[in-house]
């Protein structure tokens, strides 16, 4: 593997510093940025956290921030780390966000307009710290034709043995 240092792809702006998130390839141009655009979702953090996006038309070398950022806001202090993926069964983009001590799910037909769908976490798992950096993936069940969804959730601080921790939940997703 050979790594080459590149300039900062998405710099802080008036909305704040840039926290973690995820990228998708919009192969069908649902957002209208261009077929095959790489669309980055990230948390803009200042006195509050909001969700923003930027897109690249040159394979991720440079990104242009969406001119209508932020795309999602909240009254919650901890509102971060968007994980976005295409859900073929619903024909929509799905966003999972860490919000306080739960995960919130949103859907969108075009990566720009998001609708709240549901939340998960109350009464589930560890709650000693803030939930963050979610991931939601579908995995096959060994030896069967079944598939299960796994929601991965990091806790910081508040791990059962001190420091940070990761927990996961196995179930269905619709």
Language model segments and positions:
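Beta-rich carbohydrate-recognition and catalytic domains
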Residues: 1-82, 86-133, 138-174
